[in-house]
Every structure is written in structure tokens, then in C-alpha cells.
Amino acid sequence: MNYVGLIIVLSCLWLGSNASDPDDPLLVQLPQGKLRGRDNGSYYSYESIPYAEPPIGDLRFEAPEPYKQKWSDIFEATKTPVACLQWDQFTPGANKLVGEEDCLTVSIYKPKNSKRSSFPVVAHIHGGAFMFGAAWQNGHENVMREGKFILVKISYRLGPLGFASTGDRDLPGNYGLKDQRLALKWIKQNIASFGGEPENILLIGHSAGGASVHLQMLREDFGQLAKAAFSFSGNALDPWVVQKGARGRAFELGRNVGCESSEDSASLKKCLKSKPASELVTAVRKFLIFSYVPFAPFSPVLEPSDAPDAFLTQDPREVIKSGKFGQVPWAVSYVTEDGGYNAALLLKERKSGIAIDDLNDRWLELAPYFLFYRDTKTKKDMDDYSRKIKEDYLGNQKFDIESYSELQRLFTDILFKNSTQESLDLHRKYGKSPAYAYVYDNPAEKGIAQVLANRTDYDFGTVHGDDYFLIFENFVREVEMRPDEEIISRNFINMLADFASSDNGVLKYGECAFKNNVGSEKFQLLAIYIDGCQNRQHVEFP
């Protein structure tokens, strides 16, 4: 056992003997002092607990430091977690600035269940393209009603504050990923005090949260922090995750906020630290060339090997091929029309017509930004590729509402499905622990596509989040679950509870047991639909 593992084990043992007060379960003893949660009827909550020093001042653009302060009074863990400062796609109006820079907290939700003295733990990383989103946006009422596990929501730095990088040791980037990792360490060390089982931690996330889960898992010591991982509609190989071109964008950020005289990374970092955080985040709008496109102008990067506290120094593909990653059970998923999240905004009505009309004149300009190959090809190669994929999916059709479904399929394939297949293929060849996958096809009455398109008269199919928002309530649904969705919701929640506590990595959904892909010649894919589930084998994803 290495030093980090020993410290975690000793911390868990010590904290296990200092759990919540049996006379008052709202009071919990931590190394920092006592905190008080809230009784919500069917569950307890302990919100906005700091796990890191505030990433402000000199700590901006630095790896997070563990929270060191001691509480002389009882810490009131009753405040809804604040969103990390962001330029939020879903905030209406011109000013989309939301949140605060001091935001590195975890929030814990514990069911009341007299039959259990302890619970498995599901740690949750929210999505939002590494640019926006918040822990509070993913509701927990469905999960708490089932009463199967403790839920921990992680907040982490976003946008330029979390992911600006010059690609060298002065401003290496990936601060948001480093936040997540520190939060996981905090959970491992402290969750026993809340009645959680530190040996039964499952890490999950959706979209950028799912990609974050996969990236965390690519750390070789991940198994010391969690026993399993689940990536919903997002993984490390998606083209919008680990991007190139970050150095140019970091200096462009500097020019946008008055740091144009900075000629090297060190001086740029110093200047950016001196600027108001709101100014840095508001500058995100300068990187958007069409609505909220590209949806992830700042994202994870490859860091140089000499960077302090480096998180990711190799392409994820090479990490998986090396076998030197967290060899724990992993599941990944996609829905049949994930790309609706990216394409639906093109059906929004404007005074000059629907937005998709613009693509007829601007496809060669916009496609590299929609599909994230703007920094990987020459101008000629980008144009050739843009023409080819249009021909492959739309043929001679023009861009309009009649051809929209083909465009949405293009977005689904390139941004989600193809990379899900590639990641699963690598894990089945180089992984040692089980690797599972499912595809979901059961459209919601209202979801993220209807919100972005601002219309309900189009059948978008099963879009990004239609499965995940049955586990965690989200503002984009705005409708009650149908009876079939209530069954699916319970199946998903039970699936997570069982995965977190399983000793052999077995994964089940309802009556269907997932099949392991490791060592399999064909892809083992569980299809989940309105009235059941079925195991299917594929040479390529359907």
C-alpha cells in the first residue's frame, strides 16, 4: 500500500469512530469541527461543506489545496450549494453570468432508513460541457425516496477558471479535474462520519460529468478512491473533451481582458490572476461564434509531464492501451439521439427564419466548431472533411427542418456514439475489470432539445439526458414522469445502489444482467426501452 492509500485508510478508521451523534443525527464531527445538517423529512442533508481552500487570489489557476480551517462554532451545513462562476448556456437574456468563484464544496444526502446503520455511497459529478452546470441542478428527491444509498454532489471549477491552459508548467490547466479528485479524497476520508461505507463508493456523472468520471478512472490509483465508475453519455474519448488549441485560447482570453502585453505564460497567469473573476468568465462570450457554439471552448487538456500536480499527461487512448489506469468495473452509456443537445438550437425560430438556414451558407465555417475539429486539421482538410460528412449524412439535401433528423444523427455519431464505441473497444481489449454498456431509447415528453429549440412541435427522439433526468430531477423536464418512466427511474436507482455495493462488479438493470465486454469479440450492449430491456451483441454500435 502506498503512502496516499495508508493515509486514507487511517483517516477512515479514525472518522469511523467519530460518526454522527446518536442523540442528534444532524450533528457530525469532522477534523475541522462539528457541523449541523438539516432534517428534510425522509432524509438528512449536509450541504456546502468545503473540501478545498477557496480558489481565489493567489490560489486562482492553481491546483486545489485541502481545506485547512478549523470551526470554533458549529458549521451550519444547511445552505444550497452555490454554482461555480460560469457563463451559463441556460440562463436567459444577454447576461449569462452565474455563480461565485469560492465554490469548492461537497453536499451530502442521507436517507432515513431504520433498517440500515450504513449505506453505500454514490459520488456525483455534474455535467455542463465543463463550462456551466451546478450540483444543485441535479435533484435528489427520487434517489432519497428509494433510500438505497448516500448521495454526494461535487462542485468544481468551470470554464476558464477551471480549464484555461497554456500547455506548459506555468498554466497547465485541468484545475476542475484536480478539484474533483480532491473532493473524492475528501469523501473517502470523511464519508464514514455520515454513515457512508468508504469501501463502497461509486463515482458517476452525465455528459461532461461522465467524461470526468472516465478521466478520473484513468488515474492508476483510482481504485483507492472508488470501487466502480459509471459514465452516462460522456467519456474521455469524446472529441469535445480533451482538446487541442488551448494555448491560443488562453492568450486570446488574456487579450480580451486587457492582458495583451503578456508575452509568456508566467506573465499571462499573473495578469489573469489580477483581473476580476467575473471579467474572465464574461469573456467566454467572445469565444462563441453561433449561439453557444462551440459549447466547450475551455476543457481538459494534456499537461506536460513536468507540470506540478499534473493530472493528465498522455492521450486517454494511450493510457487505456498501457493498462495503467484504475482497473475497476466501469459502465458507459449513450442514448439514441444524444446529439439533439447540440443540434436542437438550430430549430429555434428567429425573425429571419429558423437558425438551421444559416448552415447552407456557413457550413464550412461552423462545422469545425460544432464538431470540434477546428484545432486538429488544416483549413483545406477541415473543408474537405466538412463536405464529406455532409454528403455522407445529408446527400444533396439542403439544411432545413426536413433534413434536420439526419443532421442530428450526424451530431450524435460524431460527438457521442462513435467515441463511446471506441472507448468500450479499448477497454474490452486492455481492461481487466468488467466493462459494461447500455443504449437508451425512450423519448421524454419534454427534455433538453425542446428547451434549446423553444418548440414542442418536433419529435426529437430520445435526447441527451432523457435517461439521466429520471434519476436526478432537472429543470429541463418540467413534466411529471409517466408510469413507464417511474419504473425505469426505480430500475436505474436500484442499479446504482447494487453497483456501489457489489463485491464482484456485477451490474443489473431490472431483470437484465449486463454482459461484460472485456475479452468479448462482439460488443455486449444492453438495450433499455419503454417496456423492458434486452442484451444484444453487435459488431458495431447500432
From Swiss-Prot:
PROSITE patterns reported in the protein's UniProt record: CARBOXYLESTERASE_B_1, CARBOXYLESTERASE_B_2
One cellular component term from this protein's GO annotations in UniProt: extracellular region
Gene3D superfamilies: alpha/beta hydrolase
Active site feature: S207 (acyl-ester intermediate), H464 (charge relay system)
Main localization, broad class: secreted
Reported function: Transferred from the ejaculatory bulbs of males to the female genitals upon copulation, plays an important role in the reproductive biology.
Complexes and interactors: Monomer.
Protein name per Swiss-Prot or TrEMBL: Esterase 6
